[in-house]
Amino acid sequence: MLRRLITPLRWTDFITPSTLQLAPLVELLLEPMETAANLAELQLGLQEALVNAVRHGNGGDPGKCLRIRRILTPHWVIWQIQDEGCGVPVCARSNELPERSDACCGRGFFLIHHCFDDVRWSERGNRLQLAAQRHRV
């Protein structure tokens, strides 16, 4: 007999003003991963993604908000970070390290891609989805 296992997704939504005081938010977002062997790596990647959303997406405007959804599944923890900006162009979403060490942009995306198991962008480019496998926890 074939049984279908239904495992509900659990998610939490966070809405916060654009600010660079992100340490408490990062800590809260990482609560389900507090025993992860790669916690420092995830913390670094989330911090970078949030700073990019505040600085570049929302232009540092404290009147704009970030929307973050944390999704827990049996095998993954997923963070979706959305800003109010016009989005990152497809051509700028590289996971490669910039050729020039003094390049003004691109290092953050390289770092983010190396901190998470899966990185995806919305079509518009103003929502970034980051995922970490739970078996690494």
Label each region the model flagged.
Residues 37-62:
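Conserved ATP-binding N-box helix of the HATPase_c
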Residues 78-105:
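Glycine-rich/acidic phosphate-handling loop/turn and adjacent ATP-lid/helix
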Residues 65-75:
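Short beta-strand/loop element within the Bergerat-fold HATPase_c
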Residues 69-71, 82, 122, 131:
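Solvent-exposed beta-strand sheet faces enriched in polar/charged residues
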Residues 1-44:
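Bergerat-fold GHKL ATPase/HATPase_c domain
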